Amino acid sequence: LLKVGLPGAKEGLSEKDPTIAELLKNHGYMTGQFGKNHLGDLDEHLPTNHGFDEFQGNLYHLNAEEEPEHEDYPKDPEFKKKYGPRGVIHSTADGKIEDTGPLNRKRMETIDDEVTAGALDFMDRAVKAQKPFFLWWNSSRMHVLTRLKEESRGVTGLGIYADGMVEHDKHIGQVLDKLDELGIADNTIVMYSSDNGAEAFLWPD
């Protein structure tokens, strides 16, 4: 998986690799992933082919889908069709796959709002169905480069990284509040971790 990320690359999550979603689904869990999934962009790599009932999110490092907006990106539509990134995907385990449009610079401002709303709805549906659930929510905050909507900018006076962390904290609060609202907080395991999220680019990585 060291080279996962290029649009259309054959590398990605293998069918031989077990996922926690597959293990839990066999025990009656509803399984959903919302947010970043950087494990390959072909259909066979999608989370919904690896144990997840539902997936909503992007398939690359977080600024890859902005590349077609760069001024030096090839203008030939055939190039973009063959080599360009897919958009934000919404897929389900029954084989339905919807490309909801590109994760461009403007949409980057609100993508965490989108996937948080999707995660909250998933939780509602799982509880309504009286099923245990596994939810994997991967926000884009906090990652460089990031883009914030107007109302999130300047709230700390400490720059975009701190402002983004405040927005991130709000989204986490929404998820935790949903557990309380549904009356399942005392019967739910919550794990929080970062994958990287450097506050600045540092050589050599």
Model-identified regions with their sequence ranges:
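Formylglycine-dependent sulfatase
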Residues: 1-205
